[in-house]
Amino acid sequence: MADLNAIVEQLSGLTIMEAAELVKQLEEKWGVSAAAAPVMVAAGGGAAAAAPVEEKTEFTVVLVDAGANKINVIKEVRAITGLGLKEAKDLVEGAPKEVKAGVAKAESEELKKKLEAAGAKVEVK
């Protein structure tokens, strides 16, 4: 049990970029994908009512392109994510990249506006 606690502590100290690299390496080693498996839904009879469509509550802000003013975009990415200079620079130069995931709609729109004001092209998914 102490070994598991030590692993948890080590993983908690990883940066976002390090965690993403860990996921890639584990996917390659185990031959799996971290993508969520599609859920199979049994088709009901003709009398069954259609399930109401749920509105998305969590969004992902994706940097599509840094544009001409990379320095301002890097500064904004650092402010949003809390990444160090090198990690933020790598994220911006490696576009398209996920900047922040699991954020509310209002926050995702605010982040999009900030990044676009800095000169970046951004998508909210």
From Swiss-Prot:
The keyword Iron does not apply. It holds the Pfam family Ribosomal_L12. One of its GO terms (molecular function) is structural constituent of ribosome. GO terms for biological process: translation. Gene3D superfamilies: 3.30.1390.10, Single helix bin. InterPro entries: Ribosomal_bL12 (IPR000206), Ribosomal_bL12_C (IPR013823), Ribosomal_bL12_C/ClpS-like (IPR014719), Ribosomal_bL12_oligo (IPR008932), Ribosomal_bL12_oligo_N_sf (IPR036235). One of its GO terms (cellular component) is cytoplasm. Keywords: Ribonucleoprotein, Ribosomal protein. The keyword Aminoacyl-tRNA synthetase does not apply. Homodimer. Part of the ribosomal stalk of the 50S ribosomal subunit. Forms a multimeric L10(L12)X complex, where L10 forms an elongated spine to which 2 to 4 L12 dimers bind in a sequential fashion. Binds GTP-bound translation factors. Forms part of the ribosomal stalk which helps the ribosome interact with GTP-bound translation factors. Is thus essential for accurate translation. PANTHER family: 39S RIBOSOMAL PROTEIN L12, LARGE RIBOSOMAL SUBUNIT PROTEIN BL12M. Belongs to the bacterial ribosomal protein bL12 family. This is Large ribosomal subunit protein bL12. The gene is rplL.
